[in-house]
Amino acid sequence: MSRHIQYSIVVPVYNEELVIHETYQRLKEVMDQTKENYELLFVNDGSKDRSIEILREHSLIDPRVKIIDFSRNFGHQIAITAGMDYAQGNAIVVIDADLQDPPELILEMIEKWKEGYEVVYAVRTKRKGETFFKKQTAAMFYRLLSGMTDIDIPIDTGDFRLMDRKVCDEMKRLKEKNPFVRGLVSWVGFKQTAVEYVRDERLAGETKYPLKKMLKLSMDGITTFSHKPLKLASYAGILMSGTGFLYMFIVLYLKLFTDSTITGWSSLIVIQLLFSGIVLLILGVIGEYIGRIYDEAKDRPLYIVQKSYGIENKRLYRDQHMS
């Protein structure tokens, strides 16, 4: 059955009742142009609105619509991972439900795939309808990731991309409890290329990636693919120790060889507060890594599916190959 489906379109959904019908219509119009078999795999990530009801209505009419319904909100990256677990196509496309990423670009991705590329990712050349603050924080996010991680993650890319079946299969072998999908796709390698596009403003609803979630995603990406924060913590410790010893020698020299002495508590308190802040920052960095090690050690399931619609293989590929 799996090889009879050429394309799987994975769509994570969280509170998208205002746009989900339009998303389905545009995806259907685009994929019908391929003249090949496809599936639209929606992953409902614990939506609290009518998203699941609207999706169910479409699945009853169109058998190509398949739904994974989480027991609660597990997060965008995990929803993408679940979609890849259940996808049956020879090529898998990940696209958000908010229509900021144009479904029409999928056809260009498919052409690149047919040319032999195994990963085709979309690069944003412009972002419509976003505030100056949002654009600047997004730019900082991508450049921070690029500078701090040990792999080459393309700048100004999201999770909108096409992956060959063998890329998806390799992704399923990874056991990350805090998956950072775009980083993992870069890590597995294979022949990759880019297509450029202008990102549209939201059709309706609110962004699902406010600053707080962007910071968490950035931390997940950095801690997953880099030891640089730990190295920076070590360098900071060396710098603090060196500064402390230098200050000690200055105080001793002034006391033993001159008539001058350093008086006043203000300078000492400032130095102590500065060093204490750096120590706490270092402990926080170490804590982030320890927390992720703890998540991996618990070995809990990545997500829980309370119900699925149109899915024939009820047992996860991940469970079949990881046991």
UniProtKB/Swiss-Prot annotation:
GO terms for molecular function: glycosyltransferase activity. One of its GO terms (cellular component) is plasma membrane. The keyword NADP does not apply. The chain crosses the membrane at residues 232-252, 267-287. It holds the Pfam family Glycos_transf_2. It is found in: Cell membrane. This is Uncharacterized glycosyltransferase YkcC. SUPFAM superfamilies: Nucleotide-diphospho-sugar transferases. Its main location: membrane. CDD domains: DPM1_like_bac (cd04187). It is a multi-pass membrane protein. Its EC number is 2.4.-.-. It is an enzyme of class 2 (transferase). It comes from Bacillus subtilis (strain 168). The keyword Transmembrane applies. Belongs to the glycosyltransferase 2 family. GtrB subfamily. Signal peptide: none annotated.
